[in-house]
């Protein structure tokens, strides 16, 4: 079942849906601004569970209002639906279309906020009334405090009420709501309202076996895979038991995560060697991270592109102790780096350039002597490898991208493979040659001074 790559058999259905929504004048503002649409193609067949599937029902949400063959098995456009040789489809839009959650020709929402969810709209209106009163300036200082607390609690309760009502099926008939699926985090706004979850929900509700799903944006008519921020955790549940193709991005990061190695572990701490490309802590894309894999608590971070040693705690008290050591600069760290150009062996010095985020070009950082935060790095050139200077870097501060910026701006010699600050055209296709190779900590329980080391993977394979 294709969902992350376009199945050609979906194209005729996509064209029929596009022809349909372009014919409705009331929808054209949404269409011009860009609305996600999707189709799910299937072959009418006996249900996977719950009895026989009634083919006559398939027209209920189809664009024409009657069963239509969107493609034959060989990918060619079909004619009328006949037994065994033709496909049909379901269609969906994300969020609302023409200001409504339900429209003829499309599957219904998983939870209809404009119908059965009227309580949400009424409670939302009352919370908005609190906002208007606070903005009016008529509230006393005591009222402001009380109303802000009330607004926060009611908003939180309303959000949980809504998420609990999105009950999502999978092919096995199992159901889970958004709170269960995203636990322990809070689901993002709009979760469950994208095309793929809506299509799968209707298919499983009716016992349809999906063959493929395709989504596209009406603004550019290009195919897009399901979004990661809202859909990845949902699809992990809904696609259980299907033959759906693997999420290629997730598979890629799982391959990277498999290279995570434990350097040291006891009852209080765990020290790992993080490969380049693996997140230190969970992000918005719900990809594997060191924290999620080890089920330990982060005490510091490495950039996603940086490899090397990370120290994690197994309890909150140990985490607090180690974070305090980092804050007090009691922990020593040394990095190996290969730079784009050669440098004289034995050269050493200190780079001190204040840094701040480049607000208009995140996640890049920039040097700012007026508003930047102090950043200091010691460096020493210990050799040249295949035309690239090999440095040992010892930071005294821990600013975002500090070592990358200090090499690029302070030494005018970016780190090899730096896709943000590098000058080589092939930087984006290379591994960042920056590795946290040594760290010295005081064990939170024993008080023992511990020095742990690792060797960069890339030292043995240079361009």
Predicted regions and their residues:
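RNA pseudouridine synthases
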Residues: 1-463
